């Protein structure tokens, strides 16, 4: 029982640290999310461009380009998007994952969002770099 208590305390501390070390995406959004990197507080990924695409049957997605602006290879990077209706109510959030991104490397991402009726409701989105870590 004592071990469970220690585990819960440590888990709470880790979650708090991860939540504090956020990384905001480009495009002027305030969408902050967590990072798994304890080495630095500076986000090594910059979102260079992004836009919303609508397809048939209510499919929406965000595509764009990001870059590793750090000096280390990134083993894992998430680019996340949250989708909202016209009233600003969150519909859902989705992400795209990339692995082994070298320093200076640019990469394209495509975040497939809600589909069908939910996709038709999307009026706006925001985007950010999610979890990332280096070698």
From Swiss-Prot:
It is a single-pass membrane protein. It comes from the Archaea. One of its GO terms (cellular component) is membrane. Keywords: Membrane, Transmembrane, Transmembrane helix. The chain crosses the membrane at residues 4-24. PROSITE patterns: PROKAR_LIPOPROTEIN. Its main location: membrane. It is found in: Membrane. The keyword Cell membrane does not apply. This is Uncharacterized protein MJ0360. It comes from Methanocaldococcus jannaschii (strain ATCC 43067 / DSM 2661 / JAL-1 / JCM 10045 / NBRC 100440) (Methanococcus jannaschii).
